[in-house]
Regions:
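Extended C-terminal subregions enriched in glycine
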Residues: 169-248
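Active-site-facing alpha/beta catalytic cores
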Residues: 1-172, 212-215, 222-224, 237-260
Length: 260
């Protein structure tokens, strides 16, 4: 399974490179991007209006001589990959030494994270991540304690470099206000440099009557809104969202634009 996953990942990355630098990412093509999921949605008109505004802005820029023909930044985009550094033997096999600096780098992804269940201070996942130069994410759920998270940050990032550590909160839609403020205050008190991110997916998993795991879209959205509200009140910034995606149109979440 690992060999198959590796092969599929390599193929996906090759496709991303082709799309991101072959002209498909050109903003002029915004009308041709995958719109199948939105066409029959009540939100279709809003999406179309946004497309039209982007097209109008690009037309104005073109009239000013700013276009993708002379500015590659308008037709290309950089992709950075990320995954959980869960399977340590696999991660070890993908770790390389920079011959110019002697530093270790994980080449399985640009950014790797430690899961909420594997962030033990004396665990192998923290030990591995503290030995590589990649930016590192740390999942923080309801069981996380501020002092514990600070210790992990200091262990992985002893120089307190900005941008090295991202704390990814995953408390669930009904627990953000209970846990996140304490975590933010604990980290700020110790002067630890972190980027704050929100994972509204993994804390909101429920089991349907058929036995399948699913999520309610409204719960996902509520966690995102609560996280932004807490950061605003604490004087910090939500620096990103951790969202699960799929290459196919599947119905995993209930609710949403079509109120499934």
């Amino acid at each position: 399974r690992l060999f198959k996953a590796y092969s599929q990942s390599a193929s996906t990355l090759n496709l991303l490179r082709a799309f991101s630098h072959g002209g498909f990412a050109d903003l002029k093509k915004v009308h041709t991007w995958n719109l199948g999921y939105i066409k029959k949605s009540p939100q279709a008109k809003k999406f179309k209006d946004l497309e039209d505004k982007i097209a109008d802005a690009l037309a104005f820029m073109d009239a000013c001589g700013i276009n993708s023909e002379f500015n590659r930044r308008l037709k290309t985009v950089n992709f950075w990959t990320s995954h959980e550094a869960l399977h340590l033997p696999f991660e070890e096999s993908m770790t390389r030494i920079d011959s110019t600096t002697g530093e270790y780098h994980a080449t399985s992804a640009h950014f790797v994270w430690i899961g909420d269940r594997t962030r033990q201070l004396d665990g192998g996942h923290v030990e591995y991540c503290r030995g590589i130069e990649n930016p590192i994410g740390i999942k923080c759920g309801p069981t996380s304690k501020p002092d514990e998270i600070v210790k992990i940050c200091n262990l992985i990032n002893p120089k307190n470099e900005k941008g090295k550590i991202t704390l990814i909160s995953r408390f669930g839609h009904d627990s953000v206000e209970k846990y996140l403020p304490k975590l933010i205050r604990g980290v700020k008190k110790e002067g630890v440099n972190v980027i704050w991110s929100c994972d509204p997916m993994h804390g909101n998993t429920i089991q349907s009557t058929t036995g399948y795991k699913t999520r309610r879209f409204n719960n996902v959205l509520k966690e995102v809104k609560d996280v932004f509200a807490v950061h605003q009140s604490e004087g910090t910034y939500a620096g990103g969202l951790h969202i699960e995606m799929t290459g196919q149109n599947v119905t995993e979440c209930t609710g949403g634009a079509k109120n499934i």
